[in-house]
Amino acid sequence: MRLSKEFIGLGIITASLIFGSSLPDIYKGIVILIVAGCLWFFELLPLPVTSLAIPIMAVFLGIFNLKEALTYFAHPIIFLFLGGFMLAQALKNHNLDKFIAYKLLNYGKDFKTTCFLMFLSAYFLSMWISNTSATLILLPIALGLLHKKTGKLRDFLLLGVAYSASIGGIATIIGSPPNAIASSYLDYGFFSWFKVGFPISLLLFLICTLTLYIYFKKWIPKEDIAIQARMELSRNAYKLLVIFVLIASLWIISDYLSEIFNVQYFDSVIAIFAIILLFVFNLVEVNDFKKIDWGTLILFGGALCLGGVIVKSGANTFLSEKLIAILGNLTPIVLLFLVVTITIILTNFISNTGLTGIIVPILFGVSLGIPKEILILAVGMSASCSFILPVGTPPNAIVYSEGVKKEEMMKIGMILSILSAAVITLYSILYL
């Protein structure tokens, strides 16, 4: 009888508990790291389920007690994401996300300009809502603009939307879970991340757009075309717009507010305040909590817990020493480029949240002639650069399902991956 992959995953977890119980703590941490990495990579269990298995393994192997293990699932940054998800749900409920996209697209004069504005819409929306939602919002508009056209033009427009949505997530701490994982090790707030994340995301967005235009130049029509879409906002939508601007403004100055009120993770306080405001003004309902992406929050908590396991068991120090022995002779810029490149390659095969949760704790304990802050920020930013495969990220999968050729995605994706690795490396060395 053929075993299902879920039973194989369960068997691996059980075996790790049986054979790992007699090992020293360092090796217990490495066992949990390997098991979690394998389960995430091969998706033997759903990603959130693997994340829930991490604290259980940590408890049974004696690294944490249950209270310590589950604390990571109530980390303040989890609540920052919860607030961001609820704000995104409110935008969806009242069509404010579509309104923002349509407003931008109305400025298009010809096909080229309209496409750029569509990419810009995906980039901007992805700072505040998931890259999946940003792609799905713009997909019907993009398909309508194509008028059943196929081939290179379809690849150009749809890949531009998908890649822009992924890159936009780098800009803010709530844009992508890897940002928050990296921030949790650096005690970064919303504005601290925005200061470093927005410039590199904007640069990558412009490079991505330029690369797509150059690659597909001869297939882009020159005829005039414009989207004249009108949307009327409801009274509640205007209320939401005010709250959205207020919360975004508070997040931007959250580091200063944290100092004034002497409260750590003040951006998480703002996120909780945002949820309360949304309910007070009847912009969301209790049922909207059911629509939140709880799987991502659990995955995020599991990644944080894995990081805690690696640090407490001493596995990060052990692995760091091995890393130094292998890479210690490389120059800092070559080493940084190598770390960024490996992250970008792996993020095409494994969840970027899980990947960041594995790499960051190891780098946190290493000394390779590069400040830890630069290494961790570079990994956090690189984890969102998944351009090569349809399975790499939901936006890639969405546009692939709409007819984008895998060969074109791989060609453009490889070019963008190389450019992204070089740009992030130089940015990290020169700017950070």
Curated annotation (Swiss-Prot):
Chief location bin: membrane
UniProt keywords, alphabetically: Cell membrane, Membrane, Transmembrane, Transmembrane helix, Transport
Gene Ontology terms for molecular function: succinate transmembrane transporter activity; transmembrane transporter activity
InterPro entries according to UniProt: Cit_transptr-like_dom, Na/sul_symport_CS, SLC13A/DASS
Keyword Transmembrane helix attributed: yes
TM stretches of this protein: 7-27, 29-49, 68-88, 124-144, 156-176, 196-216, 241-261, 266-286, 291-311, 326-346, 358-378, 379-399, 412-432
Coiled coil listed as a keyword: no
Recorded GO CC terms: plasma membrane
Pfam family, one: CitMHS
Highest taxon, organism lineage: Archaea
Membrane topology note: Multi-pass membrane protein
PANTHER family hit by this protein: SOLUTE CARRIER FAMILY 13 MEMBER, SOLUTE CARRIER FAMILY 13 MEMBER 2
Family affiliation: Belongs to the CitM (TC 2.A.11) transporter family.
The protein's name in its UniProt record: Uncharacterized transporter MJ0672
Species of origin: Methanocaldococcus jannaschii (strain ATCC 43067 / DSM 2661 / JAL-1 / JCM 10045 / NBRC 100440)
